[in-house]
């Protein structure tokens, strides 16, 4: 047995199976790089330069050559720039050899590192290869363009192929999962993961497309051979519906985002069910977390769901009218426009409708869906406003509400009432509650979101109903997961948390599947394996989100906060920070300015979350009134999707639509939040995925710009790190990814080792080991476990190829044996036939001998006569027997037919029964096993249930105890309440204690209610457990029938049990809490009992006091009556105060009304003023009317002013009266309060004498106290109201003064406007009569004047502001001078204190210096220690990195060593085979060269032969023509013979000669025909040999061309890249050239316009003559205008001079302030100097210390004051500096404004000069006009020439610019030519290659054409030969007939005169017609015509 050899990687490079479209080849196969290891190749360079990868900021990693290598650092030289760097060795990564460039599987790379993986992906991506294998999964990079690799030809290419036989593709992954499902009978799943915009949705669609094509039922498949594209693939109905479900889901669930134009805003899991044969029998779609908030609100540059834009852009006019649609911009919910054009939206909308129809939706359902979509948009158009006096929301315009109600089938009134004033339940009653605007808006948005989400869920259920036809027929399923990718925005919300949580779980599943389960299986199987920890455990982050308790995660905390009524988002964030603050994956915001509330460290990076409205999103509340209306809608769809809202309060039951039919009603009390529902659905999804065999497709985003052909290395590296690509490749290389059971391995591969295992050997493990030994596999390539055998990557694929080869050899041998057997049997049959023929020949020969023998004849005649007599009888008997036999035969035939049918039926029944029996046996065995497992599981569950029941019993007992305790406490409470009621009338203290006790009792009742609720929950959970137990039992019964789904439900039960255990733990925890609460209640009840004992004691004491007080009752009655009178008087005064307060409030309200009226009048006045201004500007011609209107307005203004003054006076009078009234009320209240105080004192003095009515007196006293407090509060309230009134009066006074000021300003503005109006009117009247040119210039002058006026006003205001600031500065300077003098006076008293202060300061400085020195020394030591520690830490980290790197390199080296050993053995074997093949190939090449030369020589010979044959055929043609001529001559002679009988003899002789000549020609033609046939056979033989040789040469030539094509393809790509760059530059230059051409055209147009103006000026000359007189009249007006302009200019100059003077004054003031500031600085310095001198004097006077201690203290205080004053002075100086800087800035601004004014005045002066010049020109033109028309014409011509000169100058300038642009264009063209030359050079090289290819193809075609010509010539020669033969026979026959005629004529001539009959003439003419027809057939005969169609010879003419 030959050993099985393995390749390096265990995987062959994918060959090209079958014909692949040329357009797709470059996107599937990597181009071959010939001569990799040749001289100068990349392999030599890689080996010589020691190429490595080094980090790069731009490219991620950059190629470099290793120059020097040290222990820690190495020197490298960058390959691109040649720059040298020194880097740490751990930053340098090895480079793979060039032969691994663009590897299809990155597990094949010898150097596995980030740089190599990134380089391989980048090279493949730039080559258009987007799919790459990475070990066991596939990596796909989004190309952002359409690729031709998804056609039907590509699908057929991947169909039935193994992974290593075809290039990487998502089709290959799908095919592998599909085949694994069919072979292993295990459910599969394909998980497309990646970030948003990576291409997950598109790959999911391709997977479904492939499965629909491959696994479609036979009835839906096409006939083979019928071509079809992807769009026209014909499927079955179910497959077509499955494909059409995607456009519907994309329309309703996808939207445009910043990262992706077709982003899935929901997750989906598509489950495709297959039967046993592998055909699709159904499908099911599960969706997760639709982003419903996108329907009402979108971020910037993002859009809503596609269906909105498709509906608005694609609906017809009738549909728009039915759905009440409006343009997109009219909807508030659509903030951004559509992402595509209206035409595309229309096409997409029609596609969506067609998909809905394909899936079986009725037209009514489709219309109802679109109606609901339109209604969602109408929700946003409802506008609500706030009422003026209240916060209640109103709907002023209900148009949108009417549209909404019409679409949803609601009543407008009911909808408005339910929205604005919903009914809420308060106690047992329902009340109407007014909603605020914010609450109503929120309710509208919540309803819109809920409506769209419910519509989406209904649509998914409808699709599942159409797809899931027969759920029980599915044997297995294949699931495709497409869920939203990881999202990291600037601020992320609750939706992003759910999406990222899902991706965390999926990545954890990937890590667990790839790294943990894989290694655990190695350990279970006993394989020697060291567990590798890749550090990719994401469980901490998942626990942070989903952990239920200890500590609770984010979702649990969010649910907990949702239960508290006063909880907010802020409290949630605080609780999260408190519970999870120390979690390693949780971070708080480091900066207070951060907008994020917290951050989570996900596997893809840090994500900042903003917890805004998280509680509302989690609870998802709805307006119950509107929801109930929607449930009762008349629209069927609306009522159906809102079916489950009945009974829901506060929270939306989201699960009802997701898990059951739309009409299912949720259980009451089960309030489920969005987070809980999503967590449960995600748990179900993960359980489903964990039960399947997952296949991962990792989608990568190349860039965020969505540009094709661009790859950002950093972005791709981050995604590769997050996805665990390197770890997956490493475990694929180091591990054993392929495994197979012993029995299956033996059954499948025993064919490779036929004699290795003895017969009857049963041990599977030993059998596999014997097979492995026979296969001679390297021990490093496999491991033998306990039940399986494990292989490295690619080994099983190699064994599979060897098995295929072996099976192929066996089949070939079997076919050879079968063909030999058939050939031998045919040969035996031929031999039998030959012997039979010999016998027949012998008998025939004997018969021939006997037939002429007379006795034999006699015997033959006599013998039948002997049996004649018996013959009839025998015949009759035989006839009867024959009839009987025939009847029997027919009967037996019928019986046999019936029996055969019965046998066939029984056979079918037997096979069916056998198959059923076998299936039943299998099912029975499996069911028995399953029943046993279920029985065991049932026992376990029963134990669990009994335990739960016991616990529930304990809980019930506890609840009963609590109930009894509750009753006891209630009785005790009743006793306490009765006792307290008895004591309440006696003492106020007992009343207060009763209130506190009642509060405690209420608290106890609430606690008891909580306990009851918990008890009810426990009972409900118990019932739930019982229901689940019943469900489990029923499911167990069903599971005995359903064999397939047992393994799936097992894990589901385990998950349920784990949930039960969690719930039991929660119940135990709750029970413990209840016990704690019980103990606390017991303690509190004991305390209450003690308190009650104390209260009883107090009550007894009070009763004793009551007995003592009974004697004093009578004396207290009189005093009580007096107190009642005082109280009545106090109440009366209180009522009077309240009346005064009411009057004050009424006055205040009147004041408010008056103020509002004044404000309204002021606004009306302002509006009338604005209207007046507008009317003044609009009516410039009606000056008198405007004057009257202005006077009228002034009168109104004065009247308003008077009215305002009167109102202010009235207001002052009313305020004075109010003050007096209030003061009187205060006096009265003070007197009353004084009386009350006196009454209180009397009552207190006489309190000891009260006996009888103690309780009543105390009650009255308490009422008096409360009334007093109320009076005090009212007094304070009145005082505060009085203050408010005073403040409001001051405000109104201020407002009145402001209104007066505004009126004054308005009057001033009115006056200025009136003056400006009069000026504008005069100017407008004058300017209206001027020429158009003068109008424009004067208009400019007016604008300049207005700007100068505005500038003057602004300057004046700024000057006033500067003056005010200067005054402020003066005051500050005076204050500073005063402060400085005060400081100087106080400074003298500080000298003694300064010495002591200095001494203390010096001592403290010495102490501080010593401490500072110690601190510096300690800091230096700490710094050195820190530095040492950092160095040690860095060294340790460096050593750790080096250790990890060396460990990794050691692992790689170990793997590489094993592979190299295997490679070495393989290469040695291959080398030997290659040497042998090389020798054979060389010999074959030599033989092929010789054959080619020989064939070329033969070809040349054939060409010569063909030419000679052509010439021979031409000669034959000439001979035939000659014969035809002879025929015609003979026919002419025959006619002459018939016409002339005298010349008969001569004709006979001539005919005889002609016959001989024809016979000679016929014999020559026969010889030529035989020669041509011989040559034709030789030519055919040569053609066959030539075809064989040409095929060999063609194959060799195609191989050569393939190599050249690959090299040319690589070169072509480089050229294409350069060409693209050149095209980009060329486009830029084209744009510049287009701009230049546009400018040129513009100039040309302007030139043409100037020419047209020139011609128009000639025509306008006459009009100028006509207007001359008008101009003379207008000249005077122009002079007046010029004079006015001059006067205004003079005024401007005077104003500017005044401004300059003011500016100079300000500058002088600034200088003076600067001098004062300098003087103050000098004074300050002098004061400091004096202070220093005084300090010295204090130091000298230190001897008299004892006497001056008091002075010292005073000086110290003074010194502190001086220091404070000094600080104030410094602050003042700083303020002065600031003021100075502001002044400098203002001076600068004034300077700029002055310069601007000067420029304006200069412009005005230039305008005036221009006007003067124009006037002079007009005067000159007037003189010239007076001189003559000719002079005027010359002036016009001169003016036009000047304009033309200007135009020419402009044109010249434009021409210069055009020349410059032309230079740029020429430069660009030159560069373009260089690029084009370079491209042409490259193209020339490619053309040379192409020419060589075309020459070879032409040579091949020429040879083929020569062969075809030779064949055609041979066929023509054969046809000519046949034709000549036929003609020869015709001529021969005609000659014979002529001879017969001649002989006949001769005989007749001899007998007598010749007489011709009609028959003779007819025969002669028939002969002529026959000859003519022969000629026609000879002329029209085809080369390939059959020679059998010959005309019959005419019969010889016989005499009548």
From Swiss-Prot:
Residues 101-804 form the Myosin motor domain. Residues 1981-1991 have a biased composition (Low complexity). Residues 682-704 are annotated as: Actin-binding. Residues 1173-1197, 1260-1311, 1597-1629, 1720-1751, 1910-1942, 1967-2000 are annotated as: Disordered. Residues 1971-1980 have a biased composition (Acidic residues). The keyword Signal does not apply. Keywords: Acetylation, Actin-binding, ATP-binding, Calmodulin-binding, Cell shape, Coiled coil, Motor protein, Myosin, Nucleotide-binding, Phosphoprotein. The keyword Lipid metabolism does not apply. Pfam families: Myosin_head (PF00063), Myosin_tail_1 (PF01576). Disruption phenotype: Survival to adulthood with no obvious defects in brain structure, lung and heart development and no evidence for defective cell division. Deletion in animals expressing only 12% of wild-type amounts of Myh10 results in an increase in cardiac myocyte hypertrophy and interstitial fibrosis compared with the Myh10 hypomorphic animal. One of its GO terms (cellular component) is brush border. Belongs to the TRAFAC class myosin-kinesin ATPase superfamily. Myosin family. Myosin is a hexameric protein that consists of 2 heavy chain subunits (MHC), 2 alkali light chain subunits (MLC) and 2 regulatory light chain subunits (MLC-2). This is Myosin-14. It comes from Mus musculus. The lineage of its organism: Eukaryota, Metazoa, Chordata, Craniata, Vertebrata.
């Amino acid at each position: 047995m030959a050993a099985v050899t393995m390749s390096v990687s265990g995987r062959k490079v994918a060959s090209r199976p079958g014909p692949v479209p040329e357009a797709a080849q470059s996107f599937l196969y990597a181009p071959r790089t010939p001569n990799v290891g040749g001289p100068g190749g990349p392999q030599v360079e890689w080996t010589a330069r020691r190429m490595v990868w080094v980090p790069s900021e731009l490219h991620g990693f950059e190629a470099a050559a290793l120059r020097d290598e040290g222990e820690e650092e190495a020197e490298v030289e960058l390959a691109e720039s040649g720059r040298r760097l020194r880097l740490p060795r751990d930053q340098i990564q090895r480079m793979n050899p060039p032969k691994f460039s663009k590897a299809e599987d990155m597990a094949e790379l010898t150097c596995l590192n980030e740089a190599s993986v990134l380089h391989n992906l980048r090279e493949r991506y730039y080559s258009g290869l987007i799919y790459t294998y990475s070990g066991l999964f596939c990596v796909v990079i989004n190309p952002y363009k359409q690729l031709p690799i998804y056609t039907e030809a590509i699908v057929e290419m991947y169909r039935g192929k193994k992974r290593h036989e075809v290039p990487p593709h998502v089709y290959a992954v799908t095919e592998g999962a599909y085949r694994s499902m069919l072979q292993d009978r295990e459910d599969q799943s394909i998980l497309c993961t990646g970030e948003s915009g990576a291409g997950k949705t598109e790959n999911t669609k391709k997977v479904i497309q492939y499965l629909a094509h491959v696994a479609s039922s036979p009835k839906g498949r096409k006939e083979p051979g019928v071509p079809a594209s992807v769009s026209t693939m014909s499927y079955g109905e179910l497959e077509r519906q499955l494909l059409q479900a995607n456009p519907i889901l994309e329309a309703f669930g996808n939207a445009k985002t910043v990262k992706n134009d077709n982003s899935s805003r929901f997750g989906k899991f598509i489950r495709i069910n297959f039967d046993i044969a592998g055909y699709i029998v159904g499908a099911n779609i599960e969706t997760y977390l639709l982003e419903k908030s996108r329907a009402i609100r979108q971020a910037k540059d993002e859009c809503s769901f596609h269906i909105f834009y498709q509906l608005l852009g694609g609906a017809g006019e009738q549909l728009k009218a039915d759905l009440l649609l409006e343009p997109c911009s009219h909807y508030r919910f659509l903030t951004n426009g559509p992402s595509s054009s209206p035409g595309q939206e229309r096409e997409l909308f029609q596609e969506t409708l067609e998909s809905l129809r394909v899936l079986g939706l009725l037209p009514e359902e489709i219309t109802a869906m679109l109606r609901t979509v339109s209604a969602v948009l109408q929700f946003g158009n409802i506008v609500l406003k706030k009422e003026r006096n209240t916060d209640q929301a109103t709907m002023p315009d209900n148009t949108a509400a009417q549209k909404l109600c019409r679409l949803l089938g609601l009543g407008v009134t009911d909808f408005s009432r339910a929205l604005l004033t919903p009914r809420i339940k308060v106690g047992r009653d329902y009340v109407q509650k007014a909603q605020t605007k914010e609450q109503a808006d929120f309710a509208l948005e919540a309803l819109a979101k809920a409506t769209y989400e419910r519509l989406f869920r209904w649509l998914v259920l409808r699709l599942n109903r159409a797809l899931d036809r027969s759920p029980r027929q599915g044997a297995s399923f294949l699931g495709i997961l497409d869920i939203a990718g990881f999202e990291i925005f600037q601020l992320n919300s609750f939706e992003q948390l759910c999406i990222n949580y899902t991706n965390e779980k999926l990545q954890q599943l990937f890590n667990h599947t790839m790294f943990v389960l894989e290694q655990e299986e190695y350990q279970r199987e006993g394989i020697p394996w060291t567990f590798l920890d890749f550090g990719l455990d994401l469980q901490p982050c998942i626990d942070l989100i989903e952990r239920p308790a200890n500590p609770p995660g984010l979702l649990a905390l969010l649910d907990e906060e949702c239960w508290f009524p006063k909880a907010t988002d802020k409290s949630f964030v605080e609780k999260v920070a408190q519970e999870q603050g120390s979690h390693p994956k949780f971070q708080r915001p480091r900066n207070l300015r951060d907008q994020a509330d917290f951050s989570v460290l996900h596997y893809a990076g840090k994500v900042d979350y903003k917890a805004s409205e998280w509680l509302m999103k989690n609870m998802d509340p709805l307006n119950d009134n509107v929801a109930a209306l929607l449930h009762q809608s008349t629209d069927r769809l609306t009522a159906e999707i809102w079916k489950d809202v009945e009974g829901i309060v506060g929270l939306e039951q989201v699960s009802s639509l997701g898990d059951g039919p739309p009409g299912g009603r949720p259980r009451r009390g089960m309030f489920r939040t969005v987070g809980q529902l999503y967590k449960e659905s995600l748990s179900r999804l993960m359980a489903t995925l964990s039960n399947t065999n997952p296949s991962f497709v990792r989608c990568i985003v190349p860039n965020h710009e969505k540009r094709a052909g661009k790859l950002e290395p950093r972005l791709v590296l981050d995604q590769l790190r997050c996805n665990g690509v390197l770890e997956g490749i490493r475990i694929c290389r180091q591990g054993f990814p392929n495994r197979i059971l012993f029995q299956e391995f033996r059954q499948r591969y025993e064919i490779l080792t036929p004699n290795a295992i003895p017969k009857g050997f049963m041990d599977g493990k030993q059998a596999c080991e014997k097979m492995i030994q026979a296969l001679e596999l390297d021990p490093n390539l496999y491991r033998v476990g306990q039940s399986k055998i494990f292989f490295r990557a690619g080994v099983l694929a190699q064994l599979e190829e060897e098995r295929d080869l072996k099976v192929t050899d066996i089949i070939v041998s079997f076919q050879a044996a079968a063909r030999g057997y058939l050939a031998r049997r045919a040969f035996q049959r031929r031999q039998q036939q030959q012997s039979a023929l010999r016998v027949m020949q012998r008998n025939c020969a004997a018969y021939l001998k006997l037939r002429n023998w007379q006795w034999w004849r006699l015997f033959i005649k006599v013998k039948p006569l002997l049996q004649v007599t018996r013959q009839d009888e025998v015949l009759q008997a035989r006839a009867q027997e024959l009839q009987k036999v025939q009847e029997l035969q027919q009967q037996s035939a019928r019986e046999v037919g019936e029996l055969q049918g019965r046998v066939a039926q029984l056979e079918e029944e037997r096979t069916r029964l056998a198959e059923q029996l076998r299936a039943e046996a299998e099912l029975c065995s499996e069911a028995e096993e399953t029943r046993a497992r279920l029985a065991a599981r049932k026992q376990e569950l029963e134990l669990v249930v009994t335990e739960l029941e016991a616990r529930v019993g304990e809980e019930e007992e506890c609840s009963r105890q609590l109930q009894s305790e509750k009753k006891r406490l209630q009785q005790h409470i009743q006793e306490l309440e009765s006792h307290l009621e008895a004591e309440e009338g006696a003492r106020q203290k007992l009343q207060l204690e009763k209130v506190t006790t009642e509060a405690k009792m209420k608290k106890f009742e609430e606690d008891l209610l909580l306990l009851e609720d918990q008890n009810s929950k426990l009972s409900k959970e118990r019932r739930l457990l019982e229901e689940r137990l019943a469900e489990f039992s029923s499911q167990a019964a069903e599971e005995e029938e359903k064999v397939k789904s047992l393994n799936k439900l097992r894990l589901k039960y385990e998950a349920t049990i784990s949930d039960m255990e969690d719930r039991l733990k929660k119940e135990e925890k709750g029970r413990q809490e209840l016990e704690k609460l019980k103990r606390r209640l017991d303690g509190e009840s004991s305390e209450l009992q003690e308190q009650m004992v104390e209260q009883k004691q107090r009550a007894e004491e009070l009763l004793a006091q009551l007995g003592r007080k009974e004697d004093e009752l009578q004396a207290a009655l009189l005093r009580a009556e007096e107190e009642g009178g005082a109280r009545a008087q106090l109440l009366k005064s209180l009522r009077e105060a309240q009346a005064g307060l009411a009057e004050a409030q009424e006055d205040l309200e009147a004041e408010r009304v008056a103020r509002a009226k004044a404000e309204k009048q002021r606004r009306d006045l302002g509006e009338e003023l604005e209207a007046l201004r507008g009317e003044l500007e609009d009516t410039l011609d009606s000056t008198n009317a405007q004057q009257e209107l202005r006077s009228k307005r002034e009168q109104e203004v004065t009247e308003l002013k008077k009215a305002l003054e009167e109102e202010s006076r009235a207001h002052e009078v009313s305020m004075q009266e109010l003050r007096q009234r209030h003061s009187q009320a205060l006096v009265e209240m003070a007197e009353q309060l004084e009386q009350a105080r006196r009454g209180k004192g009397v009552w207190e003095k006489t309190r000891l004498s009260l006996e009888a009515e103690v309780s009543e007196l105390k009650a009255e006293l308490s009422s008096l106290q409360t009334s007093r407090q109320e009076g005090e509060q009212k007094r304070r309230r009145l005082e505060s109201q009085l203050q408010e009134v005073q403040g409001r009066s001051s405000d109104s006074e201020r407002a009145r003064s402001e209104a007066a000021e505004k009126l004054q300003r308005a009057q001033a503005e009115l006056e200025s406007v009136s003056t400006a109006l009069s000026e504008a009117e005069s100017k407008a009247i004058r300017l209206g009569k001027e020429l158009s040119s003068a109008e424009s210039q004067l208009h400019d002058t007016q604008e300049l004047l207005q700007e100068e006026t505005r500038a003057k006003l602004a300057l004046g205001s700024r000057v006033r502001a500067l003056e005010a600031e200067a005054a402020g500065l003066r005051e500050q300077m005076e204050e500073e001078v005063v402060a400085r003098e005060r400081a100087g006076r106080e400074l003298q008293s500080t000298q003694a204190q300064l010495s002591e202060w200095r001494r203390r300061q010096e001592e403290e400085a010495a102490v501080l210096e010593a401490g500072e020195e110690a601190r510096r020394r300690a800091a230096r030591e700490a710094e050195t220690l820190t530095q040492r520690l950092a160095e040690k830490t860095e060294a340790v980290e460096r050593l750790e990195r080096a250790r990890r790197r060396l460990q990794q390199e050691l692992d790689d080296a170990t793997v590489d060593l094993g592979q190299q050993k295997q490679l070495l053995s393989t290469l040695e074997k291959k080398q030997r085979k290659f040497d042998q093949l090389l020798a054979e190939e060389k010999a074959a090449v030599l033989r092929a060269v010789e054959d080619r030369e020989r064939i070329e020589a033969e070809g040349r010979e054939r060409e010569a032969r063909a030419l000679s044959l052509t010439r021979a055929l031409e000669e034959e043609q000439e001979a035939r023509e000659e014969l035809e001529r002879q025929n015609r001559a003979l026919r002419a002679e025959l006619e002459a013979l018939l016409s002339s009988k005298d010349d008969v003899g001569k004709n006979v002789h001539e005919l005889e000669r002609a016959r001989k000549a024809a016979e000679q020609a016929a014999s020559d033609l026969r010889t030529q025909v035989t020669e041509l046939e011989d040559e034709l056979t030789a030519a055919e033989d040569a053609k066959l040999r030539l075809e064989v040789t040409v095929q060999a040469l063609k194959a060799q030539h195609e191989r050569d061309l393939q190599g050249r094509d690959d090299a040319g393809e690589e070169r072509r790509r480089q050229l294409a890249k350069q060409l693209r760059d050149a095209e980009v530059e060329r486009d830029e230059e084209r744009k510049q050239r287009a701009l230049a051409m546009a400018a040129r055209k513009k100039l040309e147009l302007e030139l043409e316009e100037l020419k047209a103006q020139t011609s128009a000026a000639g025509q306008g000359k006459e009009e100028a003559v006509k207007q001359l007189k008008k101009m003379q009249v207008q000249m005077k007006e122009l002079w007046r205008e010029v004079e006015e302009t001059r006067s205004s200019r003079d005024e401007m100059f005077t104003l500017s001079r005044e401004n300059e003077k003011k500016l100079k004054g300000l500058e002088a003031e600034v200088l003076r302030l600067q001098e004062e500031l300098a003087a103050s600085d000098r004074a300050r310095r002098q004061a400091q100097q004096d202070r220093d001198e005084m300090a010295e004097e204090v130091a000298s006077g230190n001897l008299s210390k004892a006497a001056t201690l008091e002075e010292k203290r005073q000086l110290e205080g003074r010194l502190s004051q001086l220091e404070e004053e000094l600080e104030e002075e410094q602050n003042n100086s700083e303020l002065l500096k600031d003021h100075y800087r502001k002044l400098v800035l203002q001076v600068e601004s004034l300077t700029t404004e002055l310069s601007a004014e000067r420029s304006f005045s200069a412009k005005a002066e230039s305008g005036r000069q221009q006007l003067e010049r124009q006037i002079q020109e007009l005067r000159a033109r007037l003189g010239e006009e007076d001189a003559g028309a000719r002079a005027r014409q010359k002036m016009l011509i001169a003016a036009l020439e000047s304009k033309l000169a200007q135009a020419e100058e402009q044109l010249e300038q434009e021409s210069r610019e055009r020349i410059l642009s032309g230079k740029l264009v020429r430069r660009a063209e030159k560069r373009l030519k260089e690029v084009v030359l370079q491209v042409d050079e490259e193209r020339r090289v490619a053309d040379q290659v192409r020419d060589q290819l075309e020459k070879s193809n032409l040579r091949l075609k020429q040879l083929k054409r020569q062969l075809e010509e030779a064949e055609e010539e041979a066929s023509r020669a054969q046809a000519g030969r046949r034709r000549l033969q036929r003609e020869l026979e015709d001529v021969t026959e005609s000659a014979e007939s002529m001879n017969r005629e001649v002989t006949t004529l001769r005989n007749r001539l001899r007998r007598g005169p010749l007489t011709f009959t009609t028959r003779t003439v007819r025969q002669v003419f028939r002969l002529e017609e026959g000859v003519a027809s022969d000629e026609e057939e000879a002329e029209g005969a085809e080369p390939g015509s059959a020679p059998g169609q010959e005309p019959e010879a005419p019969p010889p003419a016989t005499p009548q």
